[in-house]
Amino acid sequence: MTEKAKQSAAVTGSDEIDIGRLVGTVIEARWWVLGTTAIFALCAVIYTFFATPIYSADALVQIEQNAGNSLVQDINSALANKPPASDAEIQLIRSRLVLGKTVDDLDLDIAVTKNTFPLFGAGWERLMGRHNEMVKVTTFTRPETMSGQIFTLKVLGDKRYQLVSDGGFSAQGVVGQPLNKDGVTMRVEAIDARPDTEFTVSKFSTLGMINNLQNNLTVTETGKDTGVLSLTFTGEDRDQIREILNSITRNYLQQDIARKSEEAGKSLAFLAKQLPEVRSRLDVAENKLNAFRQDKDSVDLPLEAKAVLDSMVNIDAQLNELTFKEAEISKLFTKAHPAYRTLLEKRKALEDEKAKLNGRVTAMPKTQQEIVRLTRDVESGQQVYMQLLNKQQELKITEASTVGDVRIVDPAITQPGVLKPKKALIILGSIILGLMLSIVGVLLRSLFNRGIESPQALEEHGISVYASIPLSEWQKARDSVKTIKGIKRYKQSQLLAVGNPTDLAIEAIRSLRTSLHFAMMQAQNNVLMLTGVSPSIGKTFVCANLAAVISQTHKRVLLIDCDMRKGYTHELLGTNNVDGLSDILAGKGEIASCAKPTAIANFDLIPRGQVPPNPSELLMSERFGELIAWASSRYDLVLIDTPPILAVTDAAIVGRHAGTTLMVARYAVNTLKEVETSLSRFDQNGIQVKGVILNSIFRRATGYQDYGYYEYEYQSDSK
């Protein structure tokens, strides 16, 4: 393979590793992801149980095109059909005119709410079947000075109740009877609740309740230009929302009828004023005609004059009819509209015909002219008068039988199901949200806090790796016992080197033992210090098992627990903590008798002793140096377990007495920056760290080999 090909392959492999690492990181944190998702799902389930359900009621109304107006129907029948003005009607339904009457009719400005525990109280009441308890208040007023006070109604039983406020007001009332005290008036029509149940009574402004109705009311047209409107109203009370929607449709219908009736009423008032005047003019015309006939001795008209007279009277009648039509059509159209222009053209034609007839009358003898004029005035007046009488009767009938343009097709009905919350959707959405957030959290944590993922990552920065110890499944199982059955039992359990000597982690520690044999050849003494980067990385585990493995080679090993704050090696090895390191350094114990034998041959332990107030000062004493010198002369290896260097300075103090120093870092937990900072602290104190032990390497979901560790198992045959 050429160099260029190798580089290309390396880049490709690196890209694949990056993608695989992301997937692997999520898979490794699967229990955390699943746990987080389960919490989100549980919260969603709890919410759906306790959230207040919202119901929906719907109704259907139809806008009939110009119902009840024959004139407009006649006009529109001659024109193209004009679609109903649905948009205008929708705004009318949502107007304060309609909704305000609904608020007044149903006393919606008075709200009575049952007092429950915040957040979950209402849901609990529903689960217990007590959510239908109610108090019906039809009247509630209070002085302006009490507008900011909170009024509470307490059910006393026997149809009695007590009304109190946080301002000191208190009064008792009886159902069905008005309560009046200090300017506060209330009338309770019904109570359906247990004694001692409390309700909050609130008074809202009419405008505020209208706005609330507008927010919960939806009006849409069904289809295009159908004139059929669908009304939907949402709320918490199934019965109340049905009543509200029925009231809205009823008030909408009534206002439409009232508007039509008002129009007819105004026309009737106008006719009532005009009829006497028309009758008076008719009487005058009749008197003049009679007087002229008496004066001329009953002059008869010839047939030609009679025909002209009839034509003129007929034209006058038609002109009067057009006047009525123009009054109606002017409300709908401008003069530029085709229908209006047609009417004006017809009027002009009649007026032209009338002018011609007037010319023929002018050619007649004077007596005939006068008789024609007087007779025309009488007959035209009679026709006008009869038309007005007919119109009056017609308007009276219209006023009495007005149905309006609106028809309620479907009265309001509450849908059986719950509109919201949609339980399945909320739970599913919460599961998806929890899954996404947990995965993002895992990836962000991995991105911003990337632990050491391979020995090569350390070696590339010039840091020697003496051993890579895999995570022991056996030890992991013992750790679970710690969680379930308590720390004490866990700490008194067997070492991995004793309980499962063929474990891969012990094999790695044996490899470390071999490496230490050569690493300590040039050391100034046989003292080996093991420290850690940070707490909870398995330093004591490595130290204790390393001591056990070395002691199995028939070398005498002494383990000194220098973690006088949190050391627990004595519990791990099953020895007591009497006359430990702190006691020796404080002068309370003898160095010669401080080492305690363990259950493992050639393996002795000096426990931490009682927790002192000044562990760092004790380690700096000359007596600690004497202890190290004594131990070095009597044992093949002195192993010192110290606290993590990033936590306290004890390791820097002890390191001056050790010929060899190794540092433990945990795989995928400690970062490269932490390791470098720890090494820098040792350098500042003149201590050379030989190398790092990478502990608890586990098989990642992206493949174990990507991190420089190959798993083999080699066991003896059992026969």
From Swiss-Prot:
Could you tell me which residue ranges are on the Periplasmic side of the membrane? 52-423
The regulatory note on its activity is: Dephosphorylated and activated by wzb.
Q: What is its EC number?
A: 2.7.10.-
Q: Which residues are annotated with the PTM Phosphotyrosine?
A: Y568, Y707, Y709, Y710, Y712, Y714
Membrane topology type, per the record? Multi-pass membrane protein
| Molecular function as annotated in GO | ATP binding; protein tyrosine kinase activity
The alphabetized list of GO BP terms reads: polysaccharide biosynthetic process
Q: Where in the cell is it found?
A: Cell inner membrane
Q: Which chain regions cross the lipid bilayer? A: 31-51, 424-444
Keyword annotations for this protein, in alphabetical order, are: ATP-binding, Cell inner membrane, Cell membrane, Exopolysaccharide synthesis, Kinase, Membrane, Nucleotide-binding, Phosphoprotein, Transferase, Transmembrane, Transmembrane helix, Tyrosine-protein kinase
Q: Write down the chemical reaction(s) this protein catalyses.
A: L-tyrosyl-[protein] + ATP = O-phospho-L-tyrosyl-[protein] + ADP + H(+)
Write out the similarity annotation: Belongs to the etk/wzc family.
This chain's function reads: Required for the extracellular polysaccharide colanic acid synthesis. The autophosphorylated form is inactive. Probably involved in the export of colanic acid from the cell to medium.
Q: What is this protein called?
A: Tyrosine-protein kinase wzc
| Organism phylogeny | Bacteria, Pseudomonadati, Pseudomonadota, Gammaproteobacteria, Enterobacterales
Designated gene of the protein: wzc
